Amino acid sequence: MSKITSSTLRTFKQEGKKFTALTAYDASFAGAFDSEGIDVLLVGDSMGMVLQGHSDTLPVTVEEIAYHTRCVRRGIERALLIADMPFMSYATPEQTMINATTLMQAGANMVKVEGGKWLLESVAMLTERGIPVCAHLGLTPQSVHVFGGFKVQGRDADNAQRILDEAKALEAAGAQLLVVECIPAPLAKAITDALTIPVIGIGAGKDTDGQILVMHDVLGISSGYIPRFSKNYLKQTGEIRAAVRAYIDEVAQGIFPGSEHTFN
């Protein structure tokens, strides 16, 4: 079983092969997702909401992400493992380096940061020092209070152009992957077409190179607000591994996300 790397994902993009990602927080679920063929696993700061019961992701700490990264690492053999850098853990380049090192030493293959042009120096610094970076644009949940809630981004021409420009700048700075969240599908397609690095969408239409969802949404065990872009695969399959396979198959076939999961 060949390990997934950023080079693998670039090859998928070049070949037009859609890939899938899920969040994971422990060895058992991560192992199941890995063995069924999920390509990318994210130890997300979404744990603040789905594991810890907070209303947003802001309370999550580097130590908590590192702990769960170690757990997931022990359970997987194939998938690329990304660790989220939580709120205010990368406010300065120096702080970014210290905390990213902690997460890489915990077993991550890559770290993910939310934000645009203000991150360019940190992205370049990490890349130059051997720490791969996944960037994240659009709805960046750590900025929920700036946005005034979990709202679709990039609907007007100026903001759409800004997001596209930031995507190009982050790639130029060295980012190896990009997540785009809750942006109009045409904008996501424009970004995907403009970049050579793979683009992973969540609530961004079907034209991105890959898709990511929160595992609790895929398994229908999220409490409270259920995002429009999510889909409960356990409901239609009745078994966890079958749910994961259905998600992988629907992404590969271009069935998911459908129009009901997409913003325009």
Swiss-Prot record:
Keywords: Cytoplasm, Magnesium, Metal-binding, Pantothenate biosynthesis, Transferase
UniProt EC number: 2.1.2.11
Catalyzed reactions: 3-methyl-2-oxobutanoate + (6R)-5,10-methylene-5,6,7,8-tetrahydrofolate + H2O = 2-dehydropantoate + (6S)-5,6,7,8-tetrahydrofolate
Pfam family, one: Pantoate_transf
Cofactor binding, per record: Binds 1 Mg(2+) ion per subunit.
Any single biological process term in GO: pantothenate biosynthetic process
Residues that hold 3-methyl-2-oxobutanoate according to the record: 45-46, 84, 112
Subcellular location: Cytoplasm
Residues making up the signal peptide according to the UniProt record: none
InterPro entries: Pantoate_hydroxy_MeTrfase, Pyrv/PenolPyrv_kinase-like_dom, Pyrv_kinase-like_dom_sf
Pathway(s) served: Cofactor biosynthesis; (R)-pantothenate biosynthesis; (R)-pantoate from 3-methyl-2-oxobutanoate: step 1/2
A single Gene Ontology CC term: cytoplasm
Cited SUPFAM superfamilies: Phosphoenolpyruvate/pyruvate domain
Active site: 181
Example GO molecular function: 3-methyl-2-oxobutanoate hydroxymethyltransferase activity
Residues that hold Mg(2+) according to the record: 45, 84, 114
Entry cofactors: Mg(2+)
Family per similarity comment: Belongs to the PanB family.
Function according to Swiss-Prot or TrEMBL: Catalyzes the reversible reaction in which hydroxymethyl group from 5,10-methylenetetrahydrofolate is transferred onto alpha-ketoisovalerate to form ketopantoate.
The protein's assembly and partners: Homodecamer; pentamer of dimers.
Protein name: 3-methyl-2-oxobutanoate hydroxymethyltransferase
Species of provenance: Shewanella pealeana (strain ATCC 700345 / ANG-SQ1)
